[in-house]
Amino acid sequence: MIKFDGFSIPDNQRLIASVMVLKAASAKAKAALLSGDLTHFRTWFDGTGKNAHLMKVSSIVKEIDDAIRSRPITFANATGNAIERKEQGLCGYVWLMRNPGVGDQFSKMIHVGSGMRILIVPGTHGGNINNLAETMYHELSHKVGGTKDITYDVNTCKRNALLTPQQAALNAENYNRFLGEYIN
């Protein structure tokens, strides 16, 4: 169940449309990976052809899709709060907890609990529902996959897929760019 908190009626309408885009594109992305179509995986996660992080990326993509379909998610308006004022151009953010246990780089910061709260700044999307859907996916990759913000630059994301696939698989921006390939 997806809810919205603190948005205007026009913003709510854009968010509802963005969630529809998010659901459709997420299902396509998951289906592509599960069927073995690695075209966009190679662009955004591993251009070496070794597919070293295919299982990890596929797991995160599946977990994001599962969360979209079955977990309580609240998108809350972060417009005007202290973090949004400090971080000019902020699109969204989430809060994670440090994992005290042993784990890999993906499990150092984790989401706990069944519900998720994701803060969104709708004004930075300029009314573009596809861009907003990609931001939602980006933030969900943090929540369910433990991804990090290594780079937002599109060319660096692609270069990491070619030269350092581990960085690409860990970077949240690569996930929303991957999702963008499935938005029509």
List the predicted regions and their residue ranges.
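Predominantly extracellular/secreted Zn2+-dependent metalloproteases
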Residues: 1-133, 143-184
